[in-house]
């Protein structure tokens, strides 16, 4: 057995990055096929592979950080920098959607009737489901902050309650978003308004689902007493991600739902 003379974690070979990349490739290919009226079987297969990858990868990271002690203070610092860079990349990702929306709306082309929303498009009322969803996400931001304070104050019960509330609000938001899509009078292939609306809000909805899964894993780990007030990066990363999702939604609500309508 060799003695490690540094504080870094030398990660063992893992198949999960490969299976995760394969599931992402299958998902994008499946979506392209579905958009062209082909079978959606590949989408379901990719989702199954992605969920399996997430489960196995989370399991391995939990083992390494909680039971094997590989997540030293230096490793946690590096993970925090990594999460910050990931969120910055997500900001750039959504910036492209907002750029597309404002490019189309501030100078509508003749194809759109020189007006915004384009002629024939009945936009959604921003003060119905969108406003309710805004209140839900803001409330979930408060509850996840409550969970963080409960963890720092070592009140296990309060953290479980507040984290459960956050997850329920995330699921409720997703259900309302689906209902909004189902009842909309336009679709993704109608014009620039439909495509920018569904792509921007759809990707945000996907991030909400991922964040809800992230927080659910944190809840299960908290029930097994994995987190302490000084060793809880998994939850910290989930909370950062959730706050990012909240902020993106505020920009979506103001730009696309309110100003864009």
From Swiss-Prot:
GO cellular component, one term: mitochondrial inner membrane
GO molecular function terms attached to this record: cytochrome-c oxidase activity
Annotated membrane topology: Multi-pass membrane protein
Native species: Myxine glutinosa
Translocase as UniProt keyword: yes
Family matches, as SUPFAM superfamilies: Cytochrome c oxidase subunit III-like
Keyword Cytoplasm in record: no
Protein name: Cytochrome c oxidase subunit 3
Catalysis performed (reactions): 4 Fe(II)-[cytochrome c] + O2 + 8 H(+)(in) = 4 Fe(III)-[cytochrome c] + 2 H2O + 4 H(+)(out)
EC category name: translocase
Subcellular location: Mitochondrion inner membrane
Its biological purpose: Component of the cytochrome c oxidase, the last enzyme in the mitochondrial electron transport chain which drives oxidative phosphorylation. The respiratory chain contains 3 multisubunit complexes succinate dehydrogenase (complex II, CII), ubiquinol-cytochrome c oxidoreductase (cytochrome b-c1 complex, complex III, CIII) and cytochrome c oxidase (complex IV, CIV), that cooperate to transfer electrons derived from NADH and succinate to molecular oxygen, creating an electrochemical gradient over the inner membrane that drives transmembrane transport and the ATP synthase.
Main localisation: mitochondrion
Family label: Belongs to the cytochrome c oxidase subunit 3 family.
